[in-house]
UniProtKB/Swiss-Prot annotation:
NCBIfam families: polynuc_phos, PRK11824.1. It comes from Nitrosospira multiformis (strain ATCC 25196 / NCIMB 11849 / C 71). The lineage of its organism: Bacteria, Pseudomonadati, Pseudomonadota, Betaproteobacteria, Nitrosomonadales. InterPro entries: ExoRNase_PH_dom1 (IPR001247), ExoRNase_PH_dom2 (IPR015847), ExoRNase_PH_dom2_sf (IPR036345), KH_dom (IPR004087), KH_dom_type_1 (IPR004088), KH_dom_type_1_sf (IPR036612), NA-bd_OB-fold (IPR012340), PNPase (IPR012162). This is Polyribonucleotide nucleotidyltransferase. SMART domains: KH, S1.
Amino acid sequence: MKIKKSVTYGSHQLTFETGEIARQAHAAIMVSMGDTVVLVTVVGAKSAKQGQDFFPLTVDYQERSYAAGRIPGSFFKREGRPSEKEILTSRLIDRPIRPLFPENFYNEVQVVATVLSSDNEVDADIPAMLGASAALVLSGIPFNGPIGAARIGYINGEYVLNPDTSALKQTQLNLVVAGTRQAVLMVESDAMELSEDVMLGAIVYGHQQMQVAIDAINELADEAGVTAWDWEPPARDPALAVKIAELAENDLRAAFRQKQKQVRSETIDNIWTRVFTELGVEDGEGPDAQAVKEACFALESRIVRSQILDGEPRIDGRDTRTVRPITIRTGLLPRTHGSALFTRGETQALVVATLGTGRDEQKIDALQGDYSERFMLHYNMPPYATGETGRVGTPKRREIGHGRLAKRALVAVLPSPEEFGYSLRVVSEITESNGSSSMASVCGGCLALMDAGVPLKGHVAGIAMGLIKEGNRFAVLTDILGDEDHLGDMDFKVAGTENGITALQMDIKIQGITKEILHAALVQAREGRMHILAIMRQVLPARREDISEHAPRIIKIRINPEKIRDVIGKGGAVIRALTEETGTTIDITDDGTVMIACVNAEGGELAKKRIEDITAEVEVGRVYDGTVLKLLDFGAIVSVLPGKDGLLHISQIANERVNNVGDHLKEGQVVRVKVLEADDKGRLRLSMKAVATDVADNAAT
């Protein structure tokens, strides 16, 4: 039976449909918003695999080129591996729904969102998130939803719900928020140095507005009739938890006072190996291995969380507001354009900035059309950063997500193309990781760009905040460790300048986070950010005055657009010869802007002069140094500027009578000529005699 539910959501009509398409899936929802249509399906395994000890949720968001009336540009003319946009949207859907599955639910679940129709004014991410929420509710899979999702803009001091793509060009804020009826679960945003109050207001506003979508999903589920799965969580054995606590609690408390991550991890591993042996898990005579693992994790969590809530020092000895020790080095790689080594505790990022030309911009083939990005930030975290072995190669989803977050943080302070005509690439190599490596990439990226001489509008720093909450007691943690992220209730990353926030990312694992807690976290994050900014300014107060000697120099000039063909030449012959001769790279836009990139300044100036000569207009009455191209019986053809030739008549060569042109001129000879006339076809009449007369007159004067 086909069921349809529509509501007004912002300036668009939001429609959910089910019961017609993809009926073999456990649930399928067609979501429409404007002319954007997304099909979201959910399929779940009825039982968990033997020995499964984690929740295997997979979210795949995929865009089809036909959705925008396009044919893929690849050789095979079909969609290939996921684009960065698809990967980021998959993560955006995954993050708010993952915490809503019950603990110990290990059945495989797959969510697939396919964009079937794309409206240039409506991004498919919000419809896809809402569709995933609705499909999970209709599937009957254990899920504590639904969730709502909304995009919030901030234009002229007002919050805007689900702004169109064109409106986003004017907004100071692009924030996506998702949550249940009771609580916010996820926030992802970039901003133009906005205050904590404005950011918090946007989150609260988004949560209020999304209730419309949540109500629509609940009404759809009521009308469809949902059959809940017959799933019960495995019964816990209180006696097992007591036994494990007797065997390990004292040793664990001592282990969690070890400040070095590797030493602490090794000590804890040894404790659990001993516990497994004493309980007889390995030989099959003791309790179930999965039950023991869960009890061990619960004990770790209880120890760390209770210590923090009781006001005791954190794992590494800090209080809740202290940032780990920071060391910074800049300019450490001699041949790169800019580099920085940012170390905060046991998290370290080696960040490198590279300056390029317009042709180095990243070309992106998107559903909304092709465009280019002048700023790229790539994040790499090899396995050695955590003391492990593993696959090295193409970036994983996590690396792409962290890179995009760091990029969002820096975009607000970049100079405009008119101020600084370079394309920019920043690469963050995470060489050590113990929490908040993406925020280390923000700090290191800012310093590397300034080391490269990029005129940023200000320093940018990032910090990761955590939360421990039990009942009415809570503690906000500044600059969290990896263990605190793992055992805590929130991962809240905030980046910005001294003037305001430029990027924010929040993932909450529990319900019941209040506005007051979020405000406390934002205020505490500002304290930490200001502390880091002060250290960064001490090391590098401002950008380098000169760019690296190894970076390309860019010379920018403007020419008459009608002269572009002259610079390029037939089949590109002129510009090709020019670049080869001068050792430069030359890019010309349709409006006549010419960008000359060179490592050698002399080559750049030579290319500039040649282009100016090619595009220069010949002035009547002006004297030029011309080259004799060809001798004729009645005179000679002389080139006064590239592509500008004129006739030097035999009567204009000298004051005396000339019988033979060859007696006075030779091909290749440089002579001074005056332009006497230029007709409407551009033909020039030249004179050497007039130059001599002018010289004589000046001498007499």
